[in-house]
Structure formats: structure tokens, C-alpha cells
Swiss-Prot record:
Pathway where it operates: Amino-acid biosynthesis; L-tryptophan biosynthesis; L-tryptophan from chorismate: step 5/5
InterPro entries linked: Trp_synth_b-like, Trp_synth_b_CS, Trp_synth_beta, Trp_synth_beta/beta-like, TrpB-like_PALP, TrpB-like_PALP_sf
Listed name of the protein: Tryptophan synthase beta chain
Modified residues (N6-(pyridoxal phosphate)lysine): 100
Keywords of this entry: Amino-acid biosynthesis, Aromatic amino acid biosynthesis, Lyase, Pyridoxal phosphate, Tryptophan biosynthesis
Function: The beta subunit is responsible for the synthesis of L-tryptophan from indole and L-serine.
Similarity comment text for this entry: Belongs to the TrpB family.
Organism phylogeny: Archaea, Thermoproteota, Thermoprotei, Thermoproteales, Thermoproteaceae
Cofactor: pyridoxal 5'-phosphate
One Gene Ontology term from the biological process aspect of the record: L-tryptophan biosynthetic process
Any one GO molecular-function label of the UniProt entry: tryptophan synthase activity
SUPFAM superfamilies membership: Tryptophan synthase beta subunit-like PLP-dependent enzymes (SSF53686)
CDD domains (UniProt xref): Trp-synth_B (cd06446)
Originating organism: Pyrobaculum aerophilum (strain ATCC 51768 / DSM 7523 / JCM 9630 / CIP 104966 / NBRC 100827 / IM2)
Assembly with partners or alone: Tetramer of two alpha and two beta chains.
Length: 410
């Protein structure tokens, strides 16, 4: 069992640009102390390479099934016939079916330690909402979730399970908050940016409430490194390419940052390329601009230096709702800017075809988000020399995404 998280800030070639307040209005940086557990603020700004995992969180990790397995994709390899070896780390074995639980448990623990009785958050496809709902229940907290309206209407199974774990779930934009009312109309698909604004406003409107972000913040990426730290121990050989999908960046960071850190320190993974895979519906790393922008739609949170499509960008409704986000985490954005991380974007149809190939060769129906990594792995396997090695993170299963598969299959 991993006993510490890895912080890539200690090994970055350039100093990470700090959060910044806008030129006008009240301080957003000062707001963080009102909405986040104090330990998470410390983790957001620390330059220490290693952060100890509290025993209570480690025990929670054990209870939910960490460490998660790493498999060789022999069926997929055979179907492709390229002579490339493919490995995948599988986070779908966790109770909520995705990697999101890794940071949800940590954040809920720190919220409880700060005296909170209620937590609020945003969710797209529902993986993060489910993770927060379960983590809150395990640590004796109430949970409120603002779910993008397109997913609220289509991902009904995840909505049901959030409620089963005890959460109150609102479709976003909602009429519960001013941020929601500003965008509200019945046919609005919502966006993660709007949902973040609603969750933050909700936390500020009551007592003993804390906000739990699902991605983008550096402490979220920190917690997810349990994935990559386990994978480094499990991989029988170093990959030529490591791949993961990107919404805000926590999944990609969780899988690759321990490897990137070793590469930057000269301790291994010297030949490994790192490929971030995004949806063409939200192509921040491939078509976005590197600048300071708000991580939420209304501008409640501090500005972050990141690749962004603009905080007012509303992506179209897609099957991979968890990738419908306008920006990428600051550390990931910096790595992309420096050329250490590559990026590629795919259209939905190609991704879903790769998902079906994986289901029929490996037996796991992947989440549409995770299928982006599969699509990239398949394409890479067709281009790399025989004997090459690919490793990717399968961040979740798609058993609660039957709506997406039903629509695609017709």
C-alpha cells in the first residue's frame, strides 16, 4: 500500500505560476480559506516532493480496494496484431467504478477534520459526484452535488447511486444559486464551469460547509498519484508511451506524474513519451490558449495559468461528459507548454468504436471518458515499431453509461 502522495511541483523544470486574483473585485485567493479544508490549501501550495497519506485515508483506500490491478491487454494485442505490448491500470474495480474515489476520500477526511458537517461539489458524467457521495457517507458528512443538466437527464443510474449514498443532487444550472439562475433555462446542457460556481456559492451561503473540487486543483492531482505510484511497482517493463484521458487533468496526472517525475530526476522512464488524450468537444490542450483564466464559469475562484478555451465556453453535450471542461490543471498545462507532455484530441465516434473493440477483446466495457485513452493506445500500436510497449490508465468502467452505448449502437 502506498503511504505517500507524489507532488510534481518539486521536480518541474520551471516554477509553477501561482493562482492570481483578477484586477477587479474581491480576492478570490482569500476565498479559498473559506471554502476548502486548511490541509488542502497547504497541499495546493507545497513544494515538498512527498506528502504523507493519513492513516485514516490509507485505511479507507484499503477498504475500497486499493491497490488496483494492472493487466496486460492480450486480447487487444491479438486483435491488432502489431507486435506491440499493451498494459492498462484498471481503476474501475473501485466501488464507484472510477479513479475519482482516490481524492474524494482524502478530501472528505480533511473536511471532517476541519469540523465540516456538509460538503458540496460539481459533477459531469457523475463519477465524481458518486465518489463524493460515498466518501461523505464513509466519513459521516452530508453531500450536495450540482450535476450538469445534460448528464442529470442522461446519466440516471449514477444519479440514483448518488442518492443511494445519501447525497442531494441538483441539475445545473439550477434555481438554487444565483450562479445557476444566471444561466438557467430548461434546455441548457450545463457545464462543469457553471456547476463549480454553484457548488462554491452553496458552500459560502451556509455554516460548516466545505467545497470538494473534482479536478484542476493541484492537491487533487496530488491525491491521484496513488495510481501511478502503484503502476510503477506493477509494470514489468517501462513503456515507450504512457497514455491517459484528460478532462481537468487529475486522471492523467495520477497515472503519469510519478513516471514523469522519475524521468525529470533521471531515475527511470527516460525513453517514455507521455500522451494526454482529450475530446474534440473540449480541446483545451490542442487548441486552447495558455493564459490566466478562471476555473469556473462565473469567476468565483482564483485565476489559474492554464490551457483554456475560455471560462465561458460551454462544450456540446457528449457521451464523455467528464471531459466537458474548458481548462487543464496548471502543472499539466506547464508540462504541455514545455513539450514534456504531448496531446491529441479525438471525435466521439472514433472513441466509441475503440471502446467496443476493447469490450469485445478484453471483456471490460469502458467509460466513454476512459475510452479516449484506448483510442490513443490503438492508434499508437499501429504506428510504433514491433516490440514497443504502451501503458494506459483505464480510469473507469462504462456499466453506468448504457445510455451512451445504446445511442451509439442504435
Amino acid at each position: 500500500m502506498v503511504d505517500r502522495w507524489y507532488n510534481i511541483a518539486a521536480d518541474l523544470p520551471s516554477v509553477l505560476a501561482p493562482p492570481r486574483d483578477p484586477d477587479e473585485g474581491e480576492s478570490r485567493i482569500g476565498l479559498l480559506s473559506k471554502i476548502l479544508p486548511s490541509a488542502l490549501i497547504d497541499q495546493e501550495f507545497t513544494a515538498e516532493r512527498w506528502v504523507s497519506i493519513p492513516e485514516e485515508v490509507r485505511e479507507a483506500y484499503r477498504r475500497v480496494g486499493r491497490p488496483t490491478p494492472l493487466f496486460r491487454a492480450e486480447g487487444l494485442e491479438k486483435a491488432l496484431g502489431t507486435g506491440v505490448r499493451i498494459y492498462y491500470k484498471y481503476e474501475g474495480v473501485l466501488p464507484v467504478g472510477s479513479h475519482k474515489l482516490n481524492t474524494a476520500l482524502a478530501q472528505a477526511y480533511y473536511a471532517k477534520a476541519d469540523g465540516a458537517v456538509e460538503v458540496a461539489t460539481e459533477t459531469g458524467a457523475g463519477q465524481w459526484g458518486m465518489a463524493v457521495s460515498l466518501a461523505a457517507a464513509l466519513f459521516g458528512l452530508r453531500a450536495v452535488v450540482f450535476m450538469t443538466r445534460s448528464s442529470y437527464n442522461s446519466k440516471r443510474q449514477r444519479l440514483t447511486f448518488m442518492r443511494a449514498y445519501g447525497a442531494v443532487v441538483y441539475p445545473s444550472p439550477s434555481d438554487v444559486t444565483e450562479a445557476g439562475r444566471r444561466h438557467y433555462r430548461p434546455d441548457h446542457p450545463g457545464s462543469l464551469g457553471i456547476a463549480i460556481s454553484e457548488a462554491v456559492e452553496y458552500v459560502l451561503s451556509g455554516e460548516r460547509r466545505k467545497y470538494l473540487p473534482g479536478s484542476v486543483m493541484e492537491f487533487v492531482l496530488l491525491h491521484q498519484t496513488v495510481i501511478g505510484l502503484e503502476a510503477v511497482r506493477q509494470l514489468p517493463e517501462e513503456p515507450d508511451v504512457a497514455v491517459a484521458c484528460v478532462g481537468g487533468g487529475s486522471n492523467f496526472a495520477g497515472f503519469t506524474y510519478p513516471m514523469i517525475g522519475m524521468k525529470l530526476r533521471g531515475e527511470g522512464f527516460g525513453r517514455t513519451r507521455f500522451v494526454a488524450v482529450e475530446s474534440e468537444a473540449a480541446p483545451k490542450l490542442t487548441r486552447g490558449e495558455y493564459k490566466y483564466d478562471f476555473p469556473d464559469a462565473v469567476g468565483v475562484l482564483p485565476m489559474l495559468k492554464m490551457y483554456t478555451l475560455g471560462h465561458d465556453y460551454v462544450p456540446p453535450a457528449i457521451h464523455a461528459a467528464g471531459l466537458r471542461y474548458h481548462g487543464a490543471a496548471p502543472s499539466l498545462s506547464l508540462l504541455r507548454k514545455l513539450g514534456i507532455v504531448e496531446a491529441v484530441a479525438y471525435p466521439q465516434e472514433e472513441v466509441m468504436r475503440a471502446a467496443l473493440l476493447f469490450a469485445r477483446t478484453e471483456g471490460i466495457v469502458p467509460a466513454p471518458e476512459s475510452a479516449h485513452a484506448i483510442k490513443a493506445a490503438v492508434d499508437l500500436a499501429k504506428k510504433l515499431p514491433r516490440g514497443s510497449v504502451i501503458a494506459f490508465n483505464l480510469s473507469g468502467h462504462g456499466l453506468l453509461d448504457s445510455d451512451a452505448y445504446e445511442k451509439f449502437l442504435g
